[in-house]
């Protein structure tokens, strides 16, 4: 009986450890295409402009080494610019590269990805969890305005 419990525990542990493990080896052309669309384009959700004349924008750069940089750019009503960077790690959570994983229980479930749009459901929590929350988000290629 003890051997069965140990065997079951090992199997369960292997399943949990295999989740969200970065793929080793070569990628096929479809996988390379998804990686290129995510990493070769700088993405933004767009500039949010407020009634007082201030604005805010979040700019995302993903690297093929599994890291990202999110730059938050805030411009106050007087035109003063303030930037802050957040760095983190990401990986694919599913074998078909349809979900990005950021750690903890934070995921992006990709809805559409091409050269003009990166749309996804920003999800916190596991699928089928009644406490899971998600929000639809659209990113577009970032074009820095020239002053």
Which ranges hold each PLM region?
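Lipid interaction determinants
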Residues: 20-87, 93-147
């Amino acid at each position: 009986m003890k051997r069965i419990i140990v065997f079951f525990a090992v199997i369960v542990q292997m399943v949990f450890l295999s989740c969200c493990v970065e793929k080793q080896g070569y990628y096929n052309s479809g996988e390379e295409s998804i990686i290129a669309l995510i990493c070769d384009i700088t993405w933004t959700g767009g500039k949010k402009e407020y009634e007082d004349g201030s604005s805010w924008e979040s700019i995302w750069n993903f690297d093929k080494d599994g890291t990202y940089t999110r730059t938050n750019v805030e411009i106050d009503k007087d035109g003063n610019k303030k930037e802050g960077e957040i760095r983190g790690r990401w990986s694919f959570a599913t074998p078909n590269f349809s979900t990005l994983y950021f750690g903890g229980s934070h995921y992006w479930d990709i809805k559409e990805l091409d050269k003009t749009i990166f749309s996804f459901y920003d999800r916190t929590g596991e699928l089928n969890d009644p406490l899971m929350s998600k929000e639809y988000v659209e990113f577009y290629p970032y074009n820095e305005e020239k002053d």
